[in-house]
Amino acid sequence: MKKLLSPLLLIFLFSNCNNTPDVIVIGHRGAMGHALENTIESVEKAIDLKVDGIEIDVFKSKSGELIVYHDPSLSRLSNSTAFIEQISLDSIKKIELIGGLSIPTLNEVIDIIPEKIFLNIELKGENTAYETNKIIIKYLSESNLTPSKFIISSFRWDELKKFR
């Protein structure tokens, strides 16, 4: 009897997994694990998986653009050992990631995300708050997007204070 109840209990417990409308599903670094993290391909995969929101990380390049990447150094996912904050967007765009993918800017990511999906932008590097705020204000004024489309997070309290 015990052997019969265990599978029935599991079936009952997991049969309701798709019926949880109040749970928010967020793709971490896009759809990390399905596509290379923080790339356009990863964000598109997260959209295909019907997430409610997507989390990405940003650093500011030497030339001032916000770059979507998790680490300060490019070494983990490319052949470059450069640090994002020390090189220009032109140089970053010439760097090839694993699988021949490229490193996107924050604008490129925002441009492909549907209105119904929110974006959690993690401020990873120094001096990212002001540029992120400026980009969000631009999108809010030029589109139908609302402030609830964007969430700002960071371990860098100084950047969060600047954002306010």
Q: Positions of the model-derived regions?
A:
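Sec-dependent N-terminal signal peptides
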Residues: 4-14
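Phosphate-group recognition and catalysis centered on beta-loop-alpha active-site segments
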Residues: 16-164
